[in-house]
């Protein structure tokens, strides 16, 4: 009898990849990152096991938003109190915290459960082209 291979959590080997966000559309970049974080690029992908790799995103400040999204698209958050809805447009968000824009886009594409919260921790985003992860010997992602 043949059965489908299911990865075990202790068998998963993780790699580190770097992605340059310069002039890449935010959504397309985020979907590519989410695929790597989930492990869907591997033949050993198993839905209930975190088989993904680590991703280092560089030059987050140079990410591209097409059309008028830079000024018209908003990110909303709520404090939990009445009247506590806060809105910030992406132009302000990219000027103040460019890392946050990519993190939010990727987080929306990951599962909304314990596994998704574990996956988002493997994402490292930096505004410039410097990162402190040289010891992990990251490879550039060829996607």
Swiss-Prot record:
The lineage of its organism: Bacteria, Bacillati, Bacillota, Clostridia, Natranaerobiales. SUPFAM superfamilies: Ribosomal protein L13. GO terms for molecular function: mRNA binding; structural constituent of ribosome. It comes from Natranaerobius thermophilus (strain ATCC BAA-1301 / DSM 18059 / JW/NM-WN-LF). PANTHER family: LARGE RIBOSOMAL SUBUNIT PROTEIN UL13M (PTHR11545:SF2), RIBOSOMAL PROTEIN L13 (PTHR11545). Part of the 50S ribosomal subunit. GO terms for cellular component: cytosolic large ribosomal subunit. This protein is one of the early assembly proteins of the 50S ribosomal subunit, although it is not seen to bind rRNA by itself. It is important during the early stages of 50S assembly. Keywords: Ribonucleoprotein, Ribosomal protein. It holds the Pfam family Ribosomal_L13. Signal peptide: none annotated. The keyword Transmembrane helix does not apply. Belongs to the universal ribosomal protein uL13 family. This is Large ribosomal subunit protein uL13. InterPro entries: Ribosomal_uL13, Ribosomal_uL13_bac-type, Ribosomal_uL13_CS, Ribosomal_uL13_sf. GO terms for biological process: negative regulation of translation; translation. The keyword Ribonucleoprotein applies. Gene3D superfamilies: Ribosomal protein L13 (3.90.1180.10).
């Amino acid at each position: 009898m043949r059965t489908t291979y299911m990865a075990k959590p202790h068998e998963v080997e993780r790699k580190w990849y770097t992605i340059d966000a310069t002039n890449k559309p935010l959504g397309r970049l985020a979907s590519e990152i989410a695929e790597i974080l989930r492990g869907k690029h591997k033949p050993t992908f198993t839905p209930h096991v975190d088989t993904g790799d680590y991703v280092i995103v560089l030059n987050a400040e140079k990410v591209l938003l097409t059309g008028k999204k830079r000024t018209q698209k908003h990110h909303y958050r709520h404090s939990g109190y009445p009247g506590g809805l806060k809105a910030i447009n992406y132009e302000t968000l990219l000027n103040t915290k460019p890392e946050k824009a990519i993190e939010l886009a990727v987080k929306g594409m990951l599962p909304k459960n314990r596994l998704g919260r574990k996956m988002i921790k493997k994402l490292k985003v930096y505004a410039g082209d410097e990162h402190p992860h040289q010891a992990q010997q990251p490879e550039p992602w060829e996607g």
